[in-house]
Amino acid sequence: MVPPPLPSRGGAAKRQLGKSLGPLLLLLALGHTWTYREEPEDRDREVCSENKITTTKYPCLKSSGELTTCFRKKCCKGYKFVLGQCIPEDYDICAQAPCEQQCTDNFGRVLCTCYPGYRYDRERHQKRERPYCLDIDECATSNTTLCAHICINTMGSYHCECREGYILEDDGRTCTRGDKYPNDTGHEEKSENEVKAGTCCATCKEFSQMKQTVLQLKQKMALLPNNAAELGKYVNGDKVLASNAYLPGPPGLPGGQGPPGSPGPKGSPGFPGMPGPPGQPGPRGSMGPMGPSPDLSHIKQGRRGPVGPPGAPGRHGSKGERGAPGPPGSPGPPGSFDFLLLVLADIRNDIAELQEKVFGHRTHSSAEDFPLPQEFSSYPETLDFGSGDDYSRRTEARDPEAPRNFYP
């Protein structure tokens, strides 16, 4: 008998790979089936909305591995998504001059840049604040290395000037000692030729400003497209019309704050916010009506169980009302004065001891012998009996010669 072959690591790896690729192959197969089934219907019912956005659906897997349907929005055929809207693919996105200075079509995205001499402020651009192309102060950033004497900053550029007694060289930076107009007859910084009729003159400062302006225009024209016909096009809905559009000039100084505009239309309601913290509990409501008694006929009642142990004693309650008097009891035996006489004898002895301690001897009291009632005078042993039953026995036992003393 040939033993079965041992499972190899390669076989286990293949089984593990088959388990992991199983859901993926199932998704691909269902995706092809879905596409084959839904594609004709999607083509028939795909309608491009006014905003040129269409919605497509496709099969996808949830995190639990369950197959579901996902939706995706895209621009209609022949349109591309730029700046939050769908525009025609052949439309020049820079035709409406969306940028403050320079605009570049970066694969369907608007890329705004600034002219030389300006810096781009991203934060102001994101807040839609203008101008966001800010002038660079070359005189402040150059640390007085641009000009030999005086540096004057201008919008997008700068120019140099010399102190009195110096002239500016052709490079526009260097200053040389000397007089620029040695044969000057009275007018300052004018042309050496005499001004004639039909001619005009300008100072060196005015000429330098015009030169700087021409230089800026050359830089702007170098950035324009070669086809001048494309400069005057702009988009209006789905139609591309032609107009006499011009390049925007350099931004002017910000004006004063205008009057507040009229309030805009009411916006759509936003998304519901997060639930707030729970409030304080309200007062307790009144008790509702009693419900119907439950039907306990189907419940089987067993025998009563044994009595449990006594519980802990409760608190003492209030004193109850006085009960009704009970029936009178049977009469007791006759009383005796023996106990009272014993108490009086103890008091007499205590008084005698107190007198002995205070006076040093006992004082004789005139009332030392207590008088007896007359009905007891004929009975010398009256104080010895307790009741009538034992009187005869006590008198017989006492010695007749003993002294008669009423106190023990």
Curated annotation (Swiss-Prot):
Family named by the database record: Belongs to the CCBE1 family.
Signal peptide start and end residues: 1-35
Keywords tagged on the record: Angiogenesis, Calcium, Collagen, Developmental protein, Disulfide bond, EGF-like domain, Glycoprotein, Proteoglycan, Repeat, Secreted, Signal
Protein name: Collagen and calcium-binding EGF domain-containing protein 1
Biased composition (Pro residues): 272-281, 325-334
Transmembrane feature ranges: none
Disulphide bond pairs: 139-151, 147-160, 162-175
Glycan attachment positions: 143, 183, 387
GO cellular component, one term: extracellular matrix
Gene: Ccbe1
Start-end of Basic and acidic residues biased regions: 390-402
Low complexity bias spans: 283-294
Function: Required for lymphangioblast budding and angiogenic sprouting from venous endothelium during embryogenesis.
